[in-house]
Amino acid sequence: YVQRPGDGLLYQTKDHIRLDFGWEVVAKCFFSYRPEVAVPDIRQIKLQTGDRILLCSDGLYKSMAPDILQARMMDDKPLEEILDVYDFLCKKQGDDNYTAILIECF
């Protein structure tokens, strides 16, 4: 996720997962035995002061509604406090492991 104060969500990556017989299967990854599918998705975004970038696993974004995740991301709080809220929500509502890195541009 890339968000800008006042503008909201600028960019969100697409998850390369598909369902196969009820199981989630990675449909695309960088490390592959088939080089033709190992093409990275690259987007260029001009970042500004105050922009925030959230790198996270599916364990985080599947543990809460997208509007809650995005709203908390732009809270006027220190990044550690926002990550603590994510941690609380994942422990309360999630059933998977989770990882999150939240970055603020200066």
What positions do the PLM features span?
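C-terminal catalytic subdomain
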Residues: F31, P35-C56, L60-F106
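Short acidic-glycine loop/turn motifs at beta-strand connectors
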Residues: Q3-G8, C105-F106
